[in-house]
């Protein structure tokens, strides 16, 4: 019986070492060698202070900053540990109430006209760091007024921060909120 069991145990042990230890170490080593910033989470630092990650959204509540799309991570917005969608269906009263509250907050901040969909809808992960260029544009007047800047200058920052489709085909144009807000804080020449 042990003769029949030995090959299975050896194979299980060998595959555990290969797939559980060898492969992850190999991929980590290759990633660290070829793209260390991305392998370490695309972290953004100001000097030695960690500001955030280009890959995970964070909450900006000040009038002086562009606001992200709503987070679906529960009572603590942009909590990466609680990453998930809200799982609320399109007919859910809770979803309708949340979207209405988000739109009301935007209206109270002086944003008029048509509100882009991503201003009221969370992403699938609840942590998307991007907003649509349209959502950024409807916030330009609010941010410019709060900072005492000309709208044209803030509009130019939005243009520079807008990323196009991948290979010109995949996805939608998007603006990384953290990068845009850091550009707002950068010294002007």
Swiss-Prot record:
GO terms for molecular function: ATP binding; P-type potassium transmembrane transporter activity. The keyword Membrane applies. It is found in: Cell inner membrane. The chain crosses the membrane at residues 7-27. Pfam families: KdpC. It is a single-pass membrane protein. Keywords: ATP-binding, Cell inner membrane, Cell membrane, Ion transport, Membrane, Nucleotide-binding, Plasmid, Potassium, Potassium transport, Transmembrane, Transmembrane helix, Transport. It comes from the Bacteria. GO terms for cellular component: plasma membrane. The system is composed of three essential subunits: KdpA, KdpB and KdpC. HAMAP family: KdpC. Part of the high-affinity ATP-driven potassium transport (or Kdp) system, which catalyzes the hydrolysis of ATP coupled with the electrogenic transport of potassium into the cytoplasm. This subunit acts as a catalytic chaperone that increases the ATP-binding affinity of the ATP-hydrolyzing subunit KdpB by the formation of a transient KdpB/KdpC/ATP ternary complex. NCBIfam families: kdpC, PRK00315.1. Belongs to the KdpC family. This is Potassium-transporting ATPase KdpC subunit. It comes from Rhizobium meliloti (strain 1021).
